[in-house]
């Protein structure tokens, strides 16, 4: 067997449908499009969501939600991630260097997901009540 002798398995390939080539083909005259109407014409399709002039669903329903402009500037760090950090003093710069928050991040908040078993000092970061309690229970502290 060689690459130039490879062929698809028998019956794996279907012949292209040749429409509009006489009544003997079974797909002559109307070529599978039926009789008259917009969809039988060339170029005769309406845009997606068009409901024949009726107010479309996406315009009938109210707008909802918004895109926060500050989302990319606020980071979120888990307690479990702080456990893996090689430093004892955690601040925004340490988080950026460790890759836990993005370069554009201007502030970060610690959330109580995971466990913290070692003592750390947190500087200039926010924390949830649960995260603050877990850090202080492990012997850590917050320096503002």
From Swiss-Prot:
Keywords noted in UniProt: Ribonucleoprotein, Ribosomal protein, RNA-binding, rRNA-binding
Keyword Ribonucleoprotein: yes
Region Disordered: start-end pairs: 1-59
Record-linked Gene3D superfamilies: 3.100.10.10
A GO molecular-function annotation: structural constituent of ribosome
Gene Ontology biological-process annotations: translation
Keyword set includes Ubl conjugation: no
PROSITE patterns: RIBOSOMAL_L15 (PS00475)
Gly residues composition bias: residue spans: 21-31
InterPro entries to which the protein is assigned, alphabetical: Ribosomal_uL15 (IPR030878), Ribosomal_uL15/eL18 (IPR021131), Ribosomal_uL15/eL18_sf (IPR036227), Ribosomal_uL15_bac-type (IPR005749), Ribosomal_uL15_CS (IPR001196)
Pfam families given in the database record: Ribosomal_L27A
Top-level taxon of origin: Bacteria
GO cellular component, one term: cytosolic large ribosomal subunit
SUPFAM superfamilies recorded: Ribosomal proteins L15p and L18e
Function (record text): Binds to the 23S rRNA.
Family in the record: Belongs to the universal ribosomal protein uL15 family.
Subunit structure, as described in the record: Part of the 50S ribosomal subunit.
This protein's name: Large ribosomal subunit protein uL15
Organism name: Burkholderia thailandensis (strain ATCC 700388 / DSM 13276 / CCUG 48851 / CIP 106301 / E264)
